[in-house]
Design a protein with these regions (language model features):
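Extracellular/periplasmic catalytic domains that process cell-envelope and extracellular macromolecules
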Residues: 23-25, 47-49, 103-106
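Sec-dependent signal peptide recognition
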Residues: 1-9
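N-terminal signal peptide c-region/cleavage motif recognized by signal peptidases
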Residues: 14-16
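Secreted/periplasmic proteins that engage bacterial cell-wall peptidoglycan
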Residues: 31-71, 91
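Short, functionally critical alpha-helical segments immediately adjacent to catalytic or ligand/cofactor-binding
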Residues: 24-40, 56, 87, 108-117
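Extracytoplasmic/secreted cell-surface and envelope-processing proteins
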Residues: 41, 121-123
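Alpha-helical segment that forms one wall of the substrate-binding/catalytic cleft
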Residues: 58-120, 129-137
C-alpha cells in the first residue's frame, strides 16, 4: 500500500502532462488555426517567416523537434497534420504544470503559441488570447 501511495504522489507532483482534456486542447488548437490563417494550409505570413495553418516560424519548429521525434522538414509545416504534431510537441515541452506551477489552460496554450515559451506571462500576448477566446466562444 505504501508503494502505491508513493507512486500516486510522485505522479501528482512530477507529471509534466497538460491538465487540459483532449477536447479542450483540440478546441483551442482549432481556434488558433482560425486566428492564424483561417485554416489555410498554404498561408505564408510575417514576411515569409511563418507558414501553414498555425503560422509556424522555423525557430518554433526547431524548438518543437528538440524533445520530440516528429521528424520532417520545415516545409512539412504546410501539411496540417504535421503542423498539428509540431504545435503539440511544442506544447508538450512548454505548456506543462511543472513549468507554469499550476494547471495549464487554453489561454496558456494560445499565449505560448503566440509569444514563445514564456508567452503565458507576457502582456503582449493578451490581445492574441482575446482573439482566440472569441473564436472559442463563437463556436
Amino acid at each position: 500500500m505504501i508503494a502505491k501511495t508513493t507512486i500516486i504522489i510522485s505522479l501528482m507532483f512530477c507529471s509534466t502532462a497538460m491538465a487540459l482534456t483532449d477536447k479542450e486542447l483540440t478546441d483551442v488548437l482549432t481556434a488558433i488555426r482560425t486566428v492564424e490563417s483561417n485554416n489555410n494550409p498554404s498561408a505564408v505570413g510575417d514576411n515569409g517567416n511563418a507558414i501553414g495553418v498555425y503560422q509556424i516560424w522555423k525557430s518554433y519548429w526547431k524548438d518543437a523537434r528538440q524533445t520530440s521525434s516528429i521528424g520532417g522538414v520545415y516545409n512539412d509545416c504546410f501539411t496540417p497534420d504535421y503542423a498539428d504534431r509540431v504545435v503539440r510537441a511544442y506544447m508538450k515541452r512548454y505548456a506543462t504544470e511543472k513549468r507554469l506551477g499550476r494547471e495549464v489552460t487554453q489561454e496558456d496554450i494560445a499565449r505560448i503559441h503566440n509569444g514563445g515559451p514564456n508567452g503565458y506571462k507576457k502582456s503582449a500576448t493578451v490581445k492574441y488570447w482575446k482573439k482566440v477566446q472569441k473564436v472559442l466562444n463563437d463556436r
